[in-house]
Amino acid sequence: LDLNLTGKCALVTGSYRGTGMIIAQCLAREGARVLVHGLKAGQAEAAVEQLGLGEPVTGDITNDDGAAQLINQMAGSHIDVLVNNYGTADAGSWETSSSDEWVVAYQKNVLSAQRLITSLLPAMRDAGWGRIINLGTIGSTRPNARNPQYYASKGALATMTVSLAKELAASGVRVNLVSPGIILTPEVEAAYLARGQRKGWGSTWDEIEPHAARDIPIGRITRREEVASLVAYLASPLADAIHGQNIKIDGGILDIVS
């Protein structure tokens, strides 16, 4: 399936590592010109060298000055696709997280996206085409008690996506939210391997994963590549009728009708 992304330029925030890097790789494989983003000097350059693709850009988008730095670096490029992948799930609780930590979560998970949307949206409107894809979590619909500042901020990102979709009606710019459940990262795999071996589930990942995923209807944990493939499809002209949606990719965990 050709996603028709050749000639499109995509910025993937936080793509110097993890799921963001895999999203950048997937978009590049589909023909897009990809800007690989790091928050600190050297991060994006190292990722581009590792991947053998993309162009490095830098800016700490958790504050206005860093976002402006990033926008200035991209002054000669028209961004067709903005993937707001960057975000963090810092540990916390209702009794221990300070109000400052709540503000930090909002800066990282909401305003980092808002700053770039505000800056890049006028050119997308003028072009009559664009894609804005925000990375959320199923926790914005079903939050846990722990890390409340994280879930509250991701809930704000979800409602921001819907508000923006209404603003962009009939503009040619599409905006959606991708909400993964648990994703198989190296850290998740290592944690479950250690737990599984302690509990006697087995010694290999193939033996342990069915136990780790016992509450997931598909019987396994979602891979980062699957999230990247969904993002790439939403970034493409083929997804033109998908707008203002919160698309869950969780293996069927969130069994609700909405």
Named regions from a protein language model:
Residues 9, 16-17:
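Conserved glycine-rich cofactor-binding loop
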Residues 95, 142-148, 170-171, 189, ...:
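Active-site loop immediately N-terminal to the catalytic Tyr-X3-Lys motif
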Residues 72, 81, 89-103, 126, ...:
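Conserved mid-core segment of classical short-chain dehydrogenase/reductases
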Residues 18, 142, 220, 232, ...:
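Short C-terminal tail/terminal secondary-structure segment
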Residues 88, 95-114, 133, 150, ...:
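Catalytic Tyr-X3-Lys loop
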